[in-house]
Amino acid sequence: MSLEAFSPSRALSIGVELELQLVGTHDYDLVGAADDMLRLTAGLDLPGDIKPEMTDSMIEISTGVCDNHAMVLTQLDGLRAALVDIARRLNVGICGGGTHGFQDWGERRIFDNPRFHYLHELYGYLAKQFTVFGQHVHIGCPGPDAALYLVHGLSRYIPHLIALSASSPFLQGQDTGFQSSRLNAVFAFPLSGRAPFALSWSDFGAYFDKMSATGVVSSMKDFYWDIRPKPEYGTVEVRVMDTPLTVERAAALAAYIQALARYLMVERPIQPREDDYLVYTFNRFQACRFGYAGTYVDPENHTHCSIAEALEASFTRIEQHAIELGAEAAIGRLRADVASGRNDAWWLRGQLGPQVTLPEVVMAQCRRWMNGEGM
């Protein structure tokens, strides 16, 4: 099967997807409530979409095509409110976070969907272990070569995005020592990691044709890359973030990505090279493990700094672009969080204590999400 044609979209338009946890309100473990949630949301007039995910204790919400941060936040909050109303009728809790803190993956059930059953048959237990929760952001691109430039340009900011969004310190009842343990589950898949180096759609199509000829892939859905082009939407999809604990933080992260994309597309400040990826996996690990305190190696000059310092430099770089997009306040809140060392992983660890159990932490996560609390 050949790669489909790239459908151009409005430059810098934005869309957001969030994978959410469904938990029982008696024990705050994951609960198989996706079917009931989808049944009760069917036919509602929503500002976006609600879909199933790999297992039946997950659900995905997605905005429509948005212009800016304010539009993203309005749509996400509308979806949140609709879901919360139905969840309360079902005695179900909804929360963000990249992992559930104490669920047993062996108890998960694959959602009844042909593709999910196929993936379970192909990947075995990895499919159930993939009960992790991420935020995906789509950025509109005017053409395929612009999309590939953006894929490689944004790859330099993967550590920044991991540290900002990290919300998965707990797994299987343990503190993992990671800021984002979710990405370790993603990295287990054979077609994960980073996209191949190609700067023209013809070169990218040649790569896809070779992979298709091996029988390994049949569509772009088969690639679990951190950033990938989505030709059917005319977008670049950034897939590396943990799901935040609030829609406000999710919208702010989307605004940061949009401002980075505008900076890259307007100023064209870099000429991507294959060698940029020499430090990609190192930087990715540092962000997952240590968050803001991790080491960032500049792909171009190989200088070292903390990820917090790299983030601060990026905020300065995109300042005018954030203003043009009307996102300076939202990005300013992220900037303040970096300066004070705060992210959702920090908040989650702060909830746990000698008198506070992991189920109580999940209950607090649900309170934040369902009550519409701020960043």
Swiss-Prot record:
One of its GO terms (biological process) is modified amino acid biosynthetic process. Its EC number is 6.3.2.2. It comes from the Bacteria. It catalyses: L-cysteine + L-glutamate + ATP = gamma-L-glutamyl-L-cysteine + ADP + phosphate + H(+). GO terms for molecular function: ATP binding; glutamate-cysteine ligase activity. Keywords: ATP-binding, Ligase, Nucleotide-binding. It is an enzyme of class 6 (ligase). HAMAP family: Glu_cys_ligase_2 (MF_01609). Belongs to the glutamate--cysteine ligase type 2 family. YbdK subfamily. ATP-dependent carboxylate-amine ligase which exhibits weak glutamate--cysteine ligase activity. NCBIfam families: gshA_cyan_rel (TIGR02050), PRK13516.1 (NF010040). This is Putative glutamate--cysteine ligase 2. It comes from Azoarcus sp. (strain BH72).
